Swiss-Prot record, chains A, B:
InterPro entries named in the record: Arg_biosynth_ArgJ (IPR002813), ArgJ-like_dom_sf (IPR016117), ArgJ_beta_C (IPR042195)
GO molecular function ontology, one term from the record: L-glutamate N-acetyltransferase activity
The protein's assembly and partners: Heterotetramer of two alpha and two beta chains.
Annotated site residue numbers, Involved in the stabilization of negative charge on the oxyanion by the formation of the oxyanion hole: 118-119
Keywords carried by this UniProt record: Acyltransferase, Amino-acid biosynthesis, Arginine biosynthesis, Autocatalytic cleavage, Cytoplasm, Multifunctional enzyme, Transferase
Name used for this protein in its record: Arginine biosynthesis bifunctional protein ArgJ
SUPFAM superfamilies reported for this sequence: DmpA/ArgJ-like
An individual GO BP term: L-arginine biosynthetic process
Superkingdom, taxonomy of origin: Bacteria
Residues holding substrate: 155, 181, 192, 279, 407, 412
Entry-linked Pfam families: ArgJ (PF01960)
Site (Cleavage): 191-192
Compartments, as annotated in UniProt: Cytoplasm
C-alpha cells in the first residue's frame, strides 16, 4: 500500500510545448503490456542528466553519457522488462542498435538519442522486438502522452508517478511535467530509479547542467528504500526553450531562482513518490538533520538513521524507539560528535515532540507522546547536531514483513 | 534457529590458570535469572581491549577505557538487563559505584575493575541491586565458572557462546577460553556484542595490545548482522602469565605466532557464533573478497554484499540472485573498479561454482548449479577483484521474516 500517494489523473498532467510522447506494447519481456516509451524533443531543446555511480553501469547508461555530452539530443527511448545491464559488448551493441533505429524513425542521428532500460539484469535485450515496436510508439506521439508514459515506465511500481506545475518566468508561463519510476527493487534484480522532467523554459546549458545536478542531489539522491543502488539509475531534465522567456543565463537572477525552485519542487515530489511506493512501505519518514558543520555530515547522520534496519523495523511497529535512533546517530561516522550537544524530535504535521537532549532521553519526554506521533503514517525525525549551520534532508520508508516477502518470494 | 551452532557443554570449556569466574542472580531487570558475572584475575595478569566507536559510548565503556589504560586490572564485572548507555552523568556515577563495590569485595582498587553492561539503553542502572548481588557472585568464584558465565552474559542470544583450546608455546601448554554474546540487537534496543578471552600465556603488554586489535579486526569487526553498531561493544583479552612460558616479546618469533594463531582462531569462532545465532538467521554466509589493492577496499566490497538487504533476502529465499551481488559490488565505493576484471563464485564445503566473469554471467554458469549451492545452510560468496593481492573476509547471515518479526514485535 503506497503511503499517501494518490493515483495521478490524465488531467493532472500538462503538455510541455516542444515535447511529444508515445508508448507501445513491444513485448520486450511480457506480452500485452506497454513497455516502450518514445519521447521526441523539438529542435533547440537542451538536455542535462545525472546517472548511477554503480560500477556495473548498464550499457544504455554508458551510451547516454556519451550522447548527452555531444549535445543536440532529440529523443529519449525507454524500455521496461530488461535492463540491459551486465551484458558486456553485446549490451552496448544492442543499445546502439536501439539508437540507430530511433534515429531512423525520427530522422535524427543515433547520437541524438538517449536510451534507457529498466528490468532484469544479466539478460540480453531483445532488441529486435524493441525495434519492431518503434513504429507504434512513433504513431502514438502526442503532447498529452505523459499519462501513458508514466504507466509505461512502471516495473514493480504499484502506482504511476507524475507531477506537473507551472511558474511565471520573465512574464511567460513555464510548464514543467515529470514522471518517475522505482519502488525498491525490480524482479528479479535491482530497483532502477528513472526520472524524466521536461519544461519549456529557455535556459543556458551551463545553468541547466548545474540545476540538474542540484535537483538530483536534493531529490533522487536524498531518498533511500533499502540502501542499494541500481545499475541503471538516471535523471534527465529537458528544457525546450519554447516558453518565449528570455534565455536564463544569470545564476543570481530572479528568473533562474524561479526555475530552480520549480524544478527542485517537481524533482522532490517525483522522488518522494518512489519512497511512498517503496516495497512494503507503511510509513513515510522524513529525516531532517540540521546544525551540522557541513552538508556531508548532515547526510551521513540522515542516512545512518534512514538506512538502519533496526530504526526502520521500529517505525513499522509504530515504536518510538529512541535508543535505535540515537545509536544510529552515534555510529554515523562523525568522529568528534559531542552527543551531549544534540537534540532529537519526533514530529508530524500537527506536533513535534522533543525526545532527546544532553546525551539521553529529554526530561520532558513522555512515552505516550512518542507513541502518539509514531501512529501516524507521515513522521519526521528532526536532529539538531548543535555544531554548525548546515542541514540535509533524506526521505525513507519503514521496513515491513512485506519487504522481506516481496524480495524473497518473487520466484515462487 | 541458530545455523550450525551447537550447545556448548561444561566439559568443552577449560579453566585458565589465574582466572576465577562467578555468577549470581542480582535481579537487575528481571528476577530469577543469572544476570551478574564476576571475573577475578590473578596478580600480574595483563589485559587489553577494544571498544565500540559509537559516539553514544556507554558509561561503563568510558570507565573501561580509563581503567585499562592504568594497567594492573584485577577484575571484570558484567551485568545484563540494563546497558547503562545514554544515561549521562548518573550513568558514569553508577558505573563508578559498581567498580568501587567490586574493588571492596575483592580487595583491589576501583581503577583495577573493568565494568561491562548490556541490555536496554536510556534506562538507569539499578546499581543497588547490582551491588547487593556481588557477594553471591564472589562466593561463586571458581576456575570452572566459564560455562555459567557464558549463560549469564546472554541477552537475546538463543545459545551460549564459548570456546576453549590449547596450544604448545615454548614447551608449555597454554590454555585459551573465551565467551561471547550478541545476536543482532537486544530488547528493546541495540545489540551489544561482548567478547572475553582469557589465556595463561606470558606475553608483553605491547604484543597483547597489538594482538587484541588484530584479533578484533579479524573477528568481531568482520561480522555483520544488520549493520548497526552498539553503544557497548567490547572485546577483552586477558593473559595471566601462569603457563610458565618465557614471556613472549618478539613479534617475529614462533612463540608469538603460535599465540597469535590461537587467539585469532578462538576470536573468530566466538564472533562467528554471534552470526550463527543472528536474529532470524537461517543461513551462515562467508563473504571472501580477494585480489584487492588493499584490505580497506576488500572490506568495502565484502560489507556491501554482506549488508545488502536485497542480497540477504535472496539468501533467505535460497535464490542464486547474481544480479544483486554484482550490483552490491558495483556500489561498494571502488571508484576505478573494472567490472570486466572481476570474478564471483558461490560455494559450499563441497563445491565452488563460478557465476560471474567479464562483467556479467559466466558462460559456464548454469542456474541449477547456483540453486544447488544456495540450498545449503553455509554458503561462501568469493569475489576476486582482479587488481591486487589484498584480501578480507566478512561473515553474515540472511534476512528473514523472523528478523522483522523479532525487531518489530518485541513490545507485544
Amino acid at each position: 500500500m503506497p503511503v499517501n500517494l494518490i493515483a495521478v489523473q490524465p488531467s493532472d498532467l500538462l503538455p510541455v510545448p516542444g515535447v511529444r510522447v508515445g508508448v507501445a506494447e513491444a513485448g520486450i519481456r511480457k506480452a500485452n503490456r506497454r513497455d516502450l516509451t518514445l519521447i521526441e524533443l523539438a529542435a533547440g531543446s537542451r538536455v542535462a542528466g545525472v546517472f548511477t555511480l554503480n560500477r556495473f553501469c548498464a550499457a544504455p547508461v554508458q551510451l547516454c553519457k556519451q550522447h548527452i555530452a555531444g549535445g543536440d539530443v532529440r529523443a529519449l527511448v525507454i524500455n521496461t522488462g530488461v535492463a540491459n545491464a551486465g551484458t558486456g559488448e553485446q549490451g552496448l551493441a544492442d543499445a546502439h542498435a536501439t539508437c540507430v533505429a530511433v534515429g531512423r524513425t525520427l530522422g535524427v542521428a543515433p547520437e541524438q538519442v538517449l536510451p534507457f532500460s529498466t528490468g532484469v539484469i544479466l539478460e540480453a535485450l531483445p532488441v529486435d522486438r524493441l525495434i519492431a515496436g518503434l513504429p507504434a510508439a512513433h504513431a502514438d506521439l502526442r503532447e498529452d502522452g505523459w499519462f501513458d508514459a508514466a504507466h509505461a515506465i512502471m516495473t514493480t511500481d504499484t502506482l504511476a508517478k507524475a507531477v506537473s506545475r507551472q511558474v511565471e518566468i520573465g512574464g511567460r508561463t513555464v510548464t514543467l511535467t515529470g514522471i518517475s519510476k522505482g519502488a525498491g527493487m525490480i524482479k528479479p534484480n535491482m530497483a532502477t530509479m528513472l526520472g524524466f522532467l521536461a519544461c519549456d523554459a529557455a535556459v543556458s546549458q551551463a545553468l541547466l547542467d548545474a540545476l540538474t545536478k542540484e535537483a538530483a542531489d536534493l531529490s533522487f539522491n536524498s531518498i533511500t528504500v533499502d540502501g542499494d543502488t541500481s545499475t541503471n539509475d538516471s535523471f534527465i531534465v529537458v528544457a525546450t526553450g519554447q516558453a518565449g522567456n528570455a534565455e536564463i543565463a544569470d545564476p543570481l537572477g530572479s528568473d533562474f531562482h524561479a526555475l530552480r525552485d520549480a524544478v527542485i519542487d517537481v524533482s522532490i515530489r517525483l522522488a518522494q513518490a518512489i519512497v511512498r511506493d517503496g516495497e512494503g512501505a507503511t510509513k513515510f519518514m522524513t529525516i531532517a538533520v540540521e546544525g551540522g558543520l557541513d552538508v556531508v555530515e548532515c547526510r551521513k547522520v540522515a542516512y545512518a538513521i534512514g538506512q538502519s534496519p533496526l530504526v526502520k523495523t521500529a517505525f513499522f511497529a509504530s515504536d518510538p524507539n529512541l535508543g535505535r535512533i540515537l545509536a544510529a546517530i552515534g555510529y554515523a561516522g562523525i568522529q568528534d560528535l559531542d552527543v551531549g550537544g544534540l537534540r532529537v524530535w519526533l514530529g508530524t504535521a500537527a506536533e513535534e515532540v522533543l525526545v532527546a537532549e544532553l546525551g539521553g532521553r529529554a526530561p520532558t519526554y513522555r512515552e505516550e507522546d512518542g507513541v502518539r506521533v509514531m501512529k501516524e503514517a507521515e513522521i519526521t525525525v528532526r536532529v539538531d547536531l548543535g555544531r554548525g549551520r548546515a542541514r540535509a534532508t533524506v526521505w525513507t520508508c519503514d521496513f515491513s514483513y512485506d519487504y522481506v516477502k516481496i524480495n524473497a518470494d518473487y520466484r515462487s
